[in-house]
Amino acid sequence: MSEFNFISRLHNRGLISHITNEDNLSKLIENKSISLYCGFDPTEESLHIGHLLPLIMLKRFQIAGHRPIILIGGATSLIGDPSFKEKERVFNSNYNVNIWTEKITKQISCFLDFNCGKNSAVLLNNNTWFKQINILSFLRDVGKYFSVNTMINRAAVKQRITRPDQGISFTEFSYNLLQAYDFFILNQQYQVDLQIGGADQWGNISSGMHLIHRKTKRVVYGLTVPLLIQSNGIKFGKTESGTVWLDSNKTSPYKFYQFWMNIEDANVYYFLKLFTFIKVSEINKLEKNKNIKNQIINDKSLLAKHITQLVHGKEKLLAAERITKFLFLKNTTHIEESDLQQLKQDGIPFIEVSNVKDLQEALVLTSLAQSRTQAKNMIISNSISINTEKIRKNHIFHEKDKLFGKFTLLSRGKKQHSLLCW
């Protein structure tokens, strides 16, 4: 296989976890434009950064001349995928799923081009076909092609079946067949030859390939991207403060940007290959220089810039950079009111105040100090700043301390901050 073909380039970036019939798939996509799909169940009002790799993979295929199809699981989200889940999901209402579908559709739309000719992206909802099939038809036309023995032994559900305190309901157990039917319908109606997803979706993807082959004798393909786990064993995208969402109302662009700035050093160059479109040769050059002073920090910044702009756009990237300079480089020149609103949203701790008299009181209220005595000592020792300016004695707040008439930034040293909101 040529090292320059598309699949080889994906391997070179570390983007493939599983792939079926690799040689044939590689030949197929080198010789013609194919249709591929990835499904997203609206089980929350926003996608999170765990969804980024499949979305970016769809974008890579589209850039290479193929047609990406986004399948929103309006039907399957009412059931819930049990794959590698420790306990049964709580059922979502039709009302919530419909609202979440609208929000997630808007999020996904910014990743792909829906107006570029033959390989324009397509967005579908599997509720379209599931509302048209009855249970008897489904069992006869789909269920008969699956062995319960095989389904029970799939790794994705086996851990639940072997746990007497949990088990798995027939409802969740049937999810595998529903997703397989999605692949079958998309192959029949949209000529989809490839399904992609996270590594935890391998069992569901395999079932779809199995169903299509049994019913039509056609050969289709599956490909999964790596499931990223942090060194602490927690899934990538989870932090001490919760999930990192793609919706700017749930995770601000500043906090999103800072997430990437704070990844482990060992992952920087791997993530540049996974999440950006920078050439691998250029990333390798950066990695060779990683021991140069500040090089890794600069390369984290490069990663954060690329992904924040991809997800949130140029303007919100610039806002995240302004806030970063404001907090860490004491640059207040270009800070905007909306930037401080982002900080209040989830960037740093804040308190609402109206009649705080002096700095010592404010430091105690914000928990930057445990007592007025400690606050006094910190001020004397030159540890406290107001709006990035060092304060050397107790301070009575004035209107000039209120940025945009609303905000005052208190800092203890370089890393502890709190926002007074007047």
Curated annotation (Swiss-Prot):
InterPro entries reported for this sequence: aa-tRNA-synth_Ic, Rossmann-like_a/b/a_fold, S4_RNA-bd_sf, SYY-like_C, Tyr-tRNA-ligase, Tyr-tRNA-ligase_bac-type, Tyr-tRNA-ligase_bac_1
Motif 'HIGH' region, residue range(s) on this chain: 42-51
EC numbers for this chain: 6.1.1.1
Binding site for ATP: K238
Residues annotated as domain S4 RNA-binding: 357-414
GO molecular function: ATP binding; RNA binding; tyrosine-tRNA ligase activity
Parts forming coiled coils: none
Keywords: Aminoacyl-tRNA synthetase, ATP-binding, Cytoplasm, Ligase, Nucleotide-binding, Protein biosynthesis, RNA-binding
Subcellular location: Cytoplasm
Highest taxon listed in the record's lineage: Bacteria
Gene Ontology biological process terms from the UniProt entry: tyrosyl-tRNA aminoacylation
Motif 'KMSKS' region mapped to chain: 235-239
Catalysis performed (reactions): tRNA(Tyr) + L-tyrosine + ATP = L-tyrosyl-tRNA(Tyr) + AMP + diphosphate + H(+)
Enzyme class, first EC level, given as a word: ligase
Entry binding sites for L-tyrosine: Y37, Y175, Q179
Gene Ontology cellular-component annotations: cytosol
HAMAP family reported for this sequence: Tyr_tRNA_synth_type1
Role of this protein: Catalyzes the attachment of tyrosine to tRNA(Tyr) in a two-step reaction: tyrosine is first activated by ATP to form Tyr-AMP and then transferred to the acceptor end of tRNA(Tyr).
Quaternary state and interactors: Homodimer.
Family, as annotated: Belongs to the class-I aminoacyl-tRNA synthetase family. TyrS type 1 subfamily.
Classification via PANTHER family: TYROSINE--TRNA LIGASE, MITOCHONDRIAL (PTHR11766:SF0), TYROSYL-TRNA SYNTHETASE (PTHR11766)
Name used for this protein in its record: Tyrosine--tRNA ligase
